[in-house]
A protein has these predicted regions:
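Acidic, surface-exposed loops and disordered segments
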Residues: 1-169
């Protein structure tokens, strides 16, 4: 049996994206509390994601959302990483409030924010190990968050389009 590389790209991209999520899941978490959520988007959901990006871009005047929507459309799949908001009770003040109790609802706990960053770094590192170029997108993450692709109550969502081509979109 001969498998032409072009014929197996999609399956390979999905496999790599799944491995990226494993890396995100197993990345170190603050206080050992895991509130990170991850998923892979492909097929029709990619188009819905791109359309939402365009709508947000038009509504807010963010031209880069329109550019990024085209990148998402050209991708084979998109890995998503976000976090559930949960104050870690350190009273560290890193969020801008003296204690966790004083923190305004909706203001992210910085430990959660750092956890997302570390998970994203682990995910793109895994992609790089397979020779796949990636770029972390705030734009696609915000659209995914608005669509609820990681579930209710998940915020700080970022997206990592996965493409296997001679030139990344």
């Amino acid at each position: 049996m001969v498998y032409d590389e072009r014929d197996i790209r999609k399956a390979q991209a999905l496999d790599i994206a799944q491995k990226m999520l494993v890396a995100a899941r197993t990345a170190p978490k603050g206080k050992g509390v895991d509130v990170v959520e991850c998923a892979v988007v492909d097929s029709d959901d990619l188009e819905a994601l791109a359309c939402t990006m365009e709508a947000v871009g038009e509504e807010r005047g963010f031209a880069f959302f329109l550019r990024d929507a085209n990148c998402v459309r050209k991708s084979l799949c998109v890995a998503l990483v976000g976090t559930r908001e949960k104050a870690q009770g350190l009273n560290c003040g890193h969020c801008g409030f003296a204690t966790c109790g004083e923190r305004t609802p909706g203001v992210p706990c910085e430990v959660n924010s750092v956890d997302v960053g570390i998970a994203l770094g682990a995910a793109v590192s895994r992609a790089q190990a397979f020779g796949v170029d990636t770029r972390i997108m705030f734009s696609a993450g915000l659209a995914a968050q608005q669509l609820g692709l990681l579930g209710e109550g998940v915020g700080q969502v970022y997206a990592i389009p996965v493409s296997i081509s001679s030139k990344s979109p």
